[in-house]
């Protein structure tokens, strides 16, 4: 089984990568913003069966290029999973009142949590259109 997991650098994505390996995945195509600096990369270093790609949901070109690279490396995909999302970071905290909302924060959250996953699936569209069974989540 060939599995792509977006957001495999830590958290849920990393847990799913470990699960995919124990469930018998033959190839993993994993993404993280900075793979070499991620916990996932330390736990699942690149091998002939584990492929890491740098991808940033705030950069549409990064998403498209990553999709192209995955499609070039993978003979086919059986699972495409996207897990990354953002609730807060150094400058962005969950809002408790409407007065705390800012256009910049809302745009960043929308880009990462809504547009990023859709653009990632779009970048893999040739694989999604194939006739073989594929699960995308």
Predicted regions and their residues:
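N-terminal Rossmann NAD(P)H-binding glycine-rich loop of SDR-like oxidoreductase domains
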Residues: 9, 15-18
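Conserved glycine-rich Rossmann-like NAD(P)H-binding loop of the short-chain dehydrogenase/reductase
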Residues: 21, 25-40
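Conserved NAD(P)H cofactor-binding loop of Rossmann-fold oxidoreductase domains
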Residues: 83-94
């Amino acid at each position: 089984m060939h599995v792509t997991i977006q957001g495999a650098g830590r958290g849920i994505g990393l847990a799913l990568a470990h699960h995919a390996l124990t469930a018998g995945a033959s190839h993993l195509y994993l993404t993280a913003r900075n793979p070499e600096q991620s916990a996932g990369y330390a736990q699942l270093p690149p091998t002939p069966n584990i492929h890491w790609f740098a991808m940033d949901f705030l950069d549409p070109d990064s998403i498209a290029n990553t999709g192209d690279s995955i499609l070039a490396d993978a003979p086919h995909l059986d699972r495409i999973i996207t897990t990354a999302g953002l609730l807060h970071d150094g400058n962005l905290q969950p809002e408790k009142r409407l007065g705390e909302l800012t256009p910049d924060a809302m745009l960043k959250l929308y880009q990462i949590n809504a547009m990023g996953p859709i653009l990632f699936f779009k970048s893999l569209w040739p694989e999604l259109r194939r006739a073989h069974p594929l699960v995308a989540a």
